[in-house]
Amino acid sequence: MSKIKFFALSRYVEAGLQHAEYARDENGAVVAQVPNADGFYAQGESFEEARENLREVIEGNVMLALQLGWTIPAIEGITIEERDVQNLAA
């Protein structure tokens, strides 16, 4: 059996965005971060820009972690995990 990474990226990203916390920094920029997910933060001049930047950061961090074999934090119970699968092409 081989292993594959099984996940729904859009569901994971949406969970991150739903649970993100937003605040203005001392320079007036909006900072967005996903609690309990190191490296999942972004900023923008507005809420919308910070949210869109955070979407890109979450997607990018997940892709990088998959390539490098790093652990990806669960967000509200949504995980990206490795599973055994049977190769049906043989």
Model-derived regions, located:
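Short, charged, surface-exposed hinge/linker loops at domain edges
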Residues: 1-19, 52-90
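Structural detector for hydrophobic anchor residues on beta-strands
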Residues: 18, 30, 40-42
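Short aromatic-glycine-(Arg/Gly/Cys) micro-motifs in beta-strand/loop hairpins
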Residues: 22-37
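A short, exposed loop/beta-hairpin motif centered on an aromatic-Gly-Thr core
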Residues: 38-48
